[in-house]
Amino acid sequence: MLKKRVIPVLLLKNGRMVKGKKFKDFIDTGDPNTTVKIYSSQDADEIVFLNISKNEISKKKFINIINEASKKCSMPLTAGGGITNLEDVKELIKSGADKVVITTHLTQDFSIINDIKKKFGSQCIVAGVDYLFNKIKNK
């Protein structure tokens, strides 16, 4: 039987953790560095940070958060959001991420998987799927 793993996924927007419903109406839920300490002390198996911000300033904040979190983290750290090229992957790995999550860009350019695999190894790639269910009622 496979071991069950606890892998919290933290959404970050403008450097803060957020929670939303159906990819909107986000509310602030706290500081990511504090949360990393808590999950580390509770022996989570891995932690995932996803940057859902769309601007360059937030991308730099996210890199800094990954850097700080990796120093406090006692488990593998996975980071993603806004990754569109090898340079983005390199920055995250250099900042302390063990793996990267490719989501939206994967549907636009599947070759990025092979590029990452060649440069960093297949062990550091996670494919993510954003799924939004729209219920259509028949009248």
What are these regions (language model features)?
Residues 39-42, 69, 92, 116:
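Generic structural signal for hydrophobic
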Residues 9-12, 57-80, 111-130:
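Alpha-helix-loop-beta-strand connector modules within alpha/beta enzyme cores
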Residues 46-64, 104:
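Glycine-rich, proline-tolerant flexible connector loops at the mouths of alpha/beta enzymes
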Residues 48-51, 78, 100-102, 126:
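Conserved beta-strand positions in the central sheet of alpha/beta enzyme cores
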Residues 27-40, 84-91:
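Short, acidic/polar
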Residues 70-100:
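Catalytic cores of alpha/beta
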Residues 35-50, 95:
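Catalytic domains of carbohydrate-active enzymes, especially glycoside hydrolases
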Residues 12-24, 93, 97-139:
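Conserved anion-binding
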